[in-house]
């Protein structure tokens, strides 16, 4: 009995020591203060670290909204490393993943004198495929001379890289057309049959991850791993005792993608290309093979024409399949896949690549059949198209059951954190979408003095959003404010129409440097914005979050209207209908929470540091005229508020 009591107190003391270590790390005399220049203890940061520590101790989930400036990265890294547990850290973007692995994690490792192994793991599309490189060198590249120049740069970089991570090849643009030709996909990877298997960068990265104590991944890879494990056919990332999701607000939508199924024109074109490569290099006697691949490619191109529409379009597959031409076009693709399968079947065993292609054709055939059967309950059947490309998708309306099952079955610590999780003071929307139950919930306010540092303005006399002159009227309203601030402005739009229209208006009526999303890569736009004074960046979607511009370079953020998703979006319509059938209120239960999270992200672009000052303008009178406006305002930082543009200009001139 005495031995049992002693053992109990020994375990209790050991657990207490763990929390004490966390508290010491963040104290004024602690490890972080000693080792990290400029580190200052923050009460909110310590509270979060303690919550993560308790999640580790009791194997419970914790959900934390940590306002900008809280220091949430250190707040979860310290307890993770001190725990000694096998840890997976997942981020919403590859940019944050790289920053975490290359900057934040080494800082904490050094401060804590951490001796464990750490690893970075991305999806296979981020790594140079040696087999594809050999094929491109043998067959030639697709594209103009600039693509050839980029290939030369990749080949030179390949001689020195240790990881094969293409983001490290800084001599080529991140959107270079050579990159898709040099990476493998799940469909075309030869696996252990590949002649380059031993040197494969993906295999080596996964091996390091399996051996590491801390692995940094992203949500896409984590969800892909969940989907693979559900099938029982292996795993992409190792099991862990602690899983941390940063930028967790993105998780529900990303998880939906991976628990669904998709078929894209790119997949089909890649298939045709791979068939032609085999025909030209290994099986030159199979002339019929090349011709059949060309026929499949032509049928894919024809199908895109039958879909109709210009620019970026999204819609419901059920409605699309009402058109007989579209259904016939899909059947024609299926026929050509059957024809190719018959040809290849006679030559199985002659080429490992061809054998793999035969399997891929069978998988596409099954997927095509599923796409046509659009009646399965609980899923949204939808499509998207842009230019010559298209994608057909089957997406579950909710992942709460699948994700919630993971939480129940794995008795480990789960940490979900972001600057934007709660809506109107509650986490219900986020937790329900992921099936999170009985989690500790915590909101940590930003240490910034928003009342002094920032102004929130909903201007008076805003143009009616339903009238034809809205764009011009809004441009005229905003121009004096943007000019008074000499640019240094993000103009975040909720549609491509408004984005292009406002950019054109500013270019016509202003001497400021106007940068437009889509005219060059995201990183180059940000670089230009910072380097070229008096710039206005007009953007949508991808610039609402994950952008960190500090200091005087950015002191004005303008949002054209509340970011409600388009009511025509097929996924949203399906979620709303499902909500309605279950007795819910789609507007209050889905549309408002989604829009609040997005708005919080957009507003969060402004104040990134204690010395930042500036103005957020939201050009939507519904914030003050509709009852639901209070929900939005309650979720935003406590900035000083005004409707007077003269006060806005005066505040900016003080900056």
What is the predicted role of each segment?
Residues 53-54, 73-86, 103-107:
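Walker A/P-loop NTP-binding motif
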Residues 15-35, 85-213, 220, 275-276, ...:
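A substrate-engagement module of RecA-like helicase motors
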Residues 17-64:
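Conserved pre-motif I regulatory segment
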Residues 180-215, 226-233, 339-462, 469-476, ...:
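A contiguous, basic/glycine-rich beta-loop/short-helix subdomain that forms a polymer-engagement track
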Residues 459-469, 519-624:
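Conserved RecA-like P-loop NTPase helicase motor core
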Residues 82, 98, 103-106, 186-188, ...:
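Signature of the SF2 helicase/ATPase Hel1-core->accessory helical subdomain module
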Residues 87-95, 415-417, 487-494, 617-619:
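Conserved RecA-like ASCE P-loop NTPase motor core of nucleic-acid helicases/translocases
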């Amino acid at each position: 009995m005495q031995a049992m009591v002693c053992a109990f107190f020994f375990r209790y003391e050991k657990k207490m020591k763990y929390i004490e270590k966390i508290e010491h790390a963040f104290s004024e005399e602690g490890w972080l203060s000693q080792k990290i220049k400029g580190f200052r203890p923050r009460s909110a940061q310590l509270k979060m670290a303690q919550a993560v520590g308790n999640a580790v101790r009791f194997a419970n989930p914790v959900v934390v909204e940590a306002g900008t400036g809280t220091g949430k990265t250190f707040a979860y890294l310290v307890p993770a490393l001190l725990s000694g547990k096998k840890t997976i850290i997942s981020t919403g973007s590859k940019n944050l993943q790289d920053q975490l692995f290359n900057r934040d994690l080494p800082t904490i490792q050094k401060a804590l004198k951490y001796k464990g192994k750490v690893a970075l793991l991305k999806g296979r599309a981020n790594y140079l495929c040696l087999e594809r490189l050999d094929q491109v060198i043998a067959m030639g590249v697709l594209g103009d001379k600039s693509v050839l120049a980029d290939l030369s740069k990749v080949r030179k970089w390949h001689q020195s890289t240790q990881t094969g991570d293409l983001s490290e090849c800084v001599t080529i643009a991140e959107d270079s057309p050579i990159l898709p030709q040099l990476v493998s996909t799940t469909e075309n990877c030869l696996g252990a049959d590949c002649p380059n298997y031993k040197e494969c960068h993906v295999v080596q990265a996964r091996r390091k991850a399996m051996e590491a104590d801390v692995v940094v991944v992203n949500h896409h890879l984590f969800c892909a791993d969940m989907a693979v494990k559900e099938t029982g056919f292996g795993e992409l990332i190792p099991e862990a005792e602690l899983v941390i999701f940063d930028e967790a607000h993105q998780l529900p939508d990303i998880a939906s993608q991976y628990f669904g199924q998709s078929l894209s024109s790119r997949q089909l074109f890649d298939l045709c290309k791979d068939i032609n490569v085999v025909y030209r290099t290994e099986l030159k006697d199979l002339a019929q093979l090349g011709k059949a691949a060309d026929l499949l490619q032509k049928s894919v191109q024809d199908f895109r024409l039958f879909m109709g529409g210009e620019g970026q379009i999204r819609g419901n597959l059920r409605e699309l399949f009402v058109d007989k031409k579209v259904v016939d076009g899909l059947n024609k693709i299926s026929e050509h896949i059957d024809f190719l399968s018959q040809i290849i079947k006679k030559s199985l065993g002659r080429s490992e690549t061809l054998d793999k292609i035969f399997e891929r054709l069978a998988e596409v055939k099954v997927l095509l059949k599923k796409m046509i059967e659009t009646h399965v309950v609980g899923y949204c059947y939808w499509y998207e198209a842009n230019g010559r490309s298209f994608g057909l998708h089957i997406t579950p309306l909710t992942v709460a059951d699948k994700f919630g099952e993971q939480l129940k079955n794995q008795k480990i610590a789960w940490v979900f954190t972001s600057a934007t999780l709660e809506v109107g003071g509650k986490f219900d929307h986020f937790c329900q979408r992921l099936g999170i139950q009985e989690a500790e919930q915590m909101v940590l306010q930003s240490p910034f003095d928003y009342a002094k540092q920032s102004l929130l303005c909903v201007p008076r006399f805003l143009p009616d959003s339903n009238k034809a002159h809205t764009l011009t009227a809004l441009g005229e309203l905003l121009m004096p404010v943007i000019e008074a601030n000499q640019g240094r402005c993000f103009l975040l739009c909720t549609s491509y129409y408004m984005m292009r229209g406002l950019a054109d208006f500013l270019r016509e009526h202003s001497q400021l440097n106007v940068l437009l999303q889509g005219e060059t890569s995201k990183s180059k736009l940000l670089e230009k914005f910072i380097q070229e004074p008096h710039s206005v960046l007009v953007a949508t979607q991808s610039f609402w979050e994950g952008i960190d511009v500090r200091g005087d370079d950015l002191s004005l953020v303008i949002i054209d209207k509340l970011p409600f998703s388009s009511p025509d979006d097929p996924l949203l319509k399906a979620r709303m209908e499902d909500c309605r059938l279950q007795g819910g209120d789609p507007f209050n239960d889905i549309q408002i929470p989604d829009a609040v999270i997005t708005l919080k992200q957009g507003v969060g672009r402004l104040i990134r540091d204690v010395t930042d000052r500036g103005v957020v303008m939201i050009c939507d009178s519904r914030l003050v005229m509709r009852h639901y406006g209070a929900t939005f305002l309650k979720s935003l930082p406590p900035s000083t508020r005004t409707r007077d543009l003269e006060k806005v200009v005066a505040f900016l001139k003080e900056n």
